[in-house]
Amino acid sequence: STIGAFVIGEYPEAVAVMLFYQVGEFFQSLAVKRSRKSISDLMDIRPDSATVRRNGKLITISPENVSIGEIIIVKPGEKIPLDGVVLDGDSMLDTRALTGESVPRSVHKGDEALSGCMNQTGVLMIKTTKAFGESTASKIIDLVENASSRKAPTENFITTFARYYTPVVVILAAFLAILPPIILGEGWTEWIRRGFVFLVISCPCALVISIPLTFFGGIGAASKRGVLVKGSNYLEALNNVSVIVFDKTGTLTKGVFNVTDILPANGFSKEQVLECAAEAESFSNHPIAKSILAAYGKEMDQSVISDYKEISGYGISVMAGEKKVFAGNTKLMDTECIEYTTCEKAGTKVYLAVDGQYAGCILITDEVKPDSKKTISDLKHIGVEKTVMLTGDDEKIGKSVAEELQLDEYYAQLLPDQKVEKVELLDGKKRPGSKLAFVGDGINDAPVLARADVGIAMGGLGSDAAIEAADVVLMTDEPSKLVDAIEVAKATKQIVMQNIVIALGIKSVFLILGALGIAGMWEAVFGDVGVTIIAVLNAMRILKK
């Protein structure tokens, strides 16, 4: 445009436009750099140095040079540089950078300490368990930085649009400069000027710069709230989720089993039933066994236990001193021809028999997480059409949890492969164009996470398996983080659409004005650089979400 202005003899305008354009480009570059720095700072959880004890001395070195098994010292106000286990010291850790939670977490000797957490109160001596590159902070930042390589459909559309749009407007600008003088016989100077004005206005920078920046900012804003999104394609997919399928245990419920009732029979007391159950389960590592032993709460003399047999799918039989104890489900009672009373309450039931006589039943339940019910309500409020729960537990447990949380559907007594089948069935029924998300623990649900449009793993903090398995990782065990993720996704898409409308709308008006000779080169530069700055500043709003 500047060359064109020189050609047609508009020397002052040529110089002025060049200066104005450079000023505009400077502010545009400044806005883009600042926005990217804001996002990078948001995710800057990697410490620059580590204090290591070597040969009886404390030295400060780069975290990359610390080996696994070395002792590091972290003072109050310092970030933990590598993952490890606390050898000595008590402190409160600010985990906000990893989880988005403002409530500090207390750590003591033997507790896990994750890199990226800010030490607040006491001096900690930590034995490293992972190298710097494999530590939590490094993995999180690598995931977020690599997320830009997975582009959203809207980003791909803008890239494709710009590929065709640019040559088209160049041709139109050439036609505008050449055809009217030839056809209408008018002077060349005015139409060449209009052609260059048209060309400057039509530059697609506002879209090409602001749209990817908005998605990058959305991923940064999500990470600030303890949600890792592995790509802008998944962020946009979250915006279109209409069906969310939850695994039950560890997702909607705590996954911690507790004895909630003991129903004795045939003259046995509650204490006797619990003691017999504890004797039977004393060698088992199953969560049900642990809950019974925790409820018993006494030291178990395992020397009196003999002839221990674990009967797969049925239960356990043992000799406890002179007593023959059976502990298991109704199938075990039926197999041993023991008459028993069926417990109708919802929960996991352990039936007990001693020396062939039915002794009673122990009821064990998994507690629903405090924020699960509100999460389901909030999801429906922000536009999720259907919430579904899948569980391997029996029908009564599934129904009880589903009714308590007011879920739309539930499916119980499912094996892992059956969960995949149910997700495929639900996927086929969802609204056309919408997405299905599955939320699980990221460890036992890998096949279902892979099958869903968006796989969401919960409790990713310190869990490599969860981070690897899913498209979106909720760093804590709170279901409410899912609402945060979708809200950020919707806000991101809203800003993207605003920028598209702003850029195309303003440019369309200025293109018409330029073609008619109403808009000059000053307006043209604003129509390009000015609109880009407006779009970039609008994109920055996502960091406030």
Where are these regions (language model features)?
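Cytosolic catalytic headpiece
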Residues: 41-42, 55, 232-454, 487-490
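Conserved cytosolic headpiece of P-type ATPases
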Residues: 50, 61, 70, 82-83, ...
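Actuator/coupling domain of P-type ATPases
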Residues: 1-49, 53, 65-72, 79, ...
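Residue-level signature of catalytic and energy-coupling elements of molecular machines
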Residues: 10, 31, 50, 69, ...
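Juxtamembrane helix-loop transition segments at the membrane interface in multi-pass membrane proteins
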Residues: 27-41, 213-232, 540-545
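A short beta-strand structural signal in non-transmembrane regions
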Residues: 124-130, 350, 388, 471
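Bilayer-spanning, highly hydrophobic alpha-helical transmembrane segments
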Residues: 156-185, 194-215, 497-526
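Membrane-embedded alpha-helical bundles of multi-pass transporters
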Residues: 4, 8, 221, 383-384, ...
